[in-house]
Curated annotation (Swiss-Prot):
Entry protein name: NAD-dependent protein deacetylase
GO molecular function, one term: NAD+ binding
Entries under NCBIfam families matching the protein: PRK00481.1-1
Compartment(s) of residence: Cytoplasm
Catalytic activity: N(6)-acetyl-L-lysyl-[protein] + NAD(+) + H2O = 2''-O-acetyl-ADP-D-ribose + nicotinamide + L-lysyl-[protein]
Active site: 117 (proton acceptor)
Residues annotated as signal peptide: none
UniProt KW Membrane keyword: no
Residue numbers binding nicotinamide: 101-102
UniProt similarity note: Belongs to the sirtuin family. Class U subfamily.
EC number: 2.3.1.286
């Protein structure tokens, strides 16, 4: 049995899986990642500033235009990675903690989901607090009702993670018998720090085309994630 087949078998047999995922899960769906050679941070100088609370506060229209031009991919669809993970959550065997804000796990009907950094497609008015359909947001950054400024419910640089998301993520990890890291370099905190709350008996797998260097014991599965999940039976 190959290492990859063994890892797929481990995944199929586990009963309390936690998937910890990042932008690499959505690149097969046509959404660019952030830190690769062709990623947003490489292509755009000062991208972290453009995605900060400071830029939003100082230049709200430019912030809106930047998000609209660079982060929204409304025609993107879930790929086999999202689909297999979602199927496992629907069976009650898994949960997903993701850094992704692209809503593809929601489209895939993921049952147990923590969108740690929020969701671009959940938009609200900063004046009245009302939720607004994202289609309206892509037409205008101002609320038709009270002309308040609209923004997506995502965590910008200089903003904190919602405590409810932290609590749910920790709860999932404490119950895990298997943690699967996929599509992330696992260097962004506090997301990467969540691993410290895992069940001490949980096995950790990392699925990535390139080897990862992580400061804890784990099994490296060096394979493209699409190929890996195509071989997973759910």
């Amino acid at each position: 049995m190959s290492d990859i087949t063994a890892a797929q078998t481990t995944l199929q047999q586990a009963q309390h899986i936690v998937f910890m995922t990042g932008a690499g899960v959505s690149t097969p769906s046509g959404i660019p990642d952030y830190r690769s050679k062709n990623g947003l941070y490489t292509e755009h100088h000062n991208a972290e500033y453009y995605l900060s609370h400071a830029f939003l506060a100082e230049h709200p229209l430019e912030f809106y235009q930047y998000l609209q031009s660079n982060l929204y991919y409304p025609d993107a669809q879930p790929n086999v990675i999202h689909q297999k993970m979602a199927a496992l959550t629907q069976q009650g065997r898994a949960s997903v903690i993701t850094q992704n804000i692209d809503n593809l796990y929601g489209v895939a009907k993921t049952a147990q989901l923590v969108e740690f950094h929020g969701n671009l497609y959940q938009v609200y008015c900063t004046k009245c607090g009302q939720h607004v359909d994202w289609h309206e947001y892509l037409k205008s950054p101002y609320h038709q009702t009270d002309h308040g400024y609209l923004r997506p419910n995502v965590v910008l640089y200089d903003e904190g993670i919602a405590s409810a998301n932290i609590e749910r993520a920790v709860q999932y990890l404490q119950q895990a018998d298997l943690v699967v890291i996929c599509g992330t370099s696992f260097r962004v905190y506090p997301f990467a720090g969540l691993i410290d709350y895992r069940n001490p008996k949980a096995q950790v797998l990392a699925i990535n085309a390139e080897p990862l260097q992580l400061p804890f014991a784990f099994t490296m599965v060096q394979q493209d994630a699409v190929d890996f999940f195509e071989g997973v039976q759910v």
